[in-house]
């Protein structure tokens, strides 16, 4: 129902005369409007998708990709809706919606493409997180988005995602570790190791000559 363009087909109100009720005349159109069912359907789609977009967590790569796909679908649906409104009778409403969506799309993709060029990876197009950990070993390198905003990384500790990229990050030995955000790129160095339930974890923090206070609280479960 919410995806049918027929819901937004303009309806014309024409005065009916008893003598000429079978004769249609375009000159006698009093008012043209779009049925309320179209707006109800459009509102229902947005009411369902926007809370879903806000409730989806980004603690794993899969969930973050799903959230990004929901965002793309929401923008695409409203863009198609705006095109239908422009082609119909609600030209001002459709034009304003198209202008808003075009500006939003431009700002979004400029930010994502900048991340892609900075990281030399396509991951930012499908993962809407804006903080990344990039590591390099002797023979390979890897990069994953993260949810924390502080420039630190603890290898083999509190691993919430089990995808191949996260597994690589938490199981390899690095010669270089970098924290990358929207406006900064910080090199991290290993400062200490600690053991929890037989698993050895390494703490990476920004390189500094000053002392770095660390407070590590062990989680209730450790997944490796």
From Swiss-Prot:
Main localization (coarse):
host cell
Its membrane topology, per UniProt?
Multi-pass membrane protein
Any idea where this protein resides?
A: Host membrane; Host Golgi apparatus
Question: Per the record, GO CC terms?
Answer: host cell Golgi apparatus; host cell membrane; membrane
For the CoV 3a-like viroporin CD domain, which residue ranges apply? 131-188
Swiss-Prot/TrEMBL keywords: Host Golgi apparatus, Host membrane, Host-virus interaction, Inhibition of host innate immune response by virus, Membrane, Transmembrane, Transmembrane helix, Viral immunoevasion
Tell me which residues make up the CoV 3a-like viroporin TM domain: 32-127
- What residue ranges are annotated as transmembrane? 36-56, 68-88, 89-109
Q: Does the keyword DNA repair apply?
A: no
Family annotation (InterPro entries)? a/bCoV_VIROPORIN_3A-like_CD, a/bCoV_VIROPORIN_3A-like_TM, MERS-CoV-like_ORF5
Q: A GO term (biological process) for this protein?
A: symbiont-mediated suppression of host type I interferon-mediated signaling pathway
Q: What does this protein do?
A: Seems to play a role in the inhibition of host innate immune repsonse.
The protein's name is Non-structural protein ORF5
Q: Which organism is it from?
A: Middle East respiratory syndrome-related coronavirus (isolate United Kingdom/H123990006/2012)
């Amino acid at each position: 129902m919410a995806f049918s363009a027929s819901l937004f087909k303009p309806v014309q109100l024409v005065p009916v005369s008893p003598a000429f009720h079978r004769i249609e005349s375009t000159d006698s159109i009093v008012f043209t409007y779009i049925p309320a069912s179209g707006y109800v359907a459009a509102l229902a789609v947005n009411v369902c998708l926007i809370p879903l977009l806000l409730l989806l967590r980004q603690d794993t790569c899969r969930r973050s990709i799903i959230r990004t796909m929901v965002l793309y679908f929401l923008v695409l649906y409203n863009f198609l809706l705006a095109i239908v409104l422009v082609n119909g009778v609600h030209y001002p409403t459709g034009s304003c919606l198209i202008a808003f969506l075009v500006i939003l799309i431009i700002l979004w993709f400029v930010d994502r493409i900048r991340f892609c060029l900075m990281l030399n990876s396509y991951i930012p197009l499908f993962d809407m997180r804006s903080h990344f950990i990039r590591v390099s070993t002797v023979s390979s390198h890897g990069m994953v988005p993260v949810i924390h905003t502080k420039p630190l990384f603890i290898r083999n500790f509190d691993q919430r995602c089990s995808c191949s990229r996260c597994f690589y990050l938490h199981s390899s030995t690095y010669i270089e570790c970098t924290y990358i955000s929207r406006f900064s790129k910080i090199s991290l160095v290993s400062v200490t190791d600690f053991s929890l339930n037989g698993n050895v974890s390494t703490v990476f923090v920004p390189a500094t000559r000053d002392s770095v206070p660390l407070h590590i609280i062990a989680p209730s479960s450790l997944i490796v």
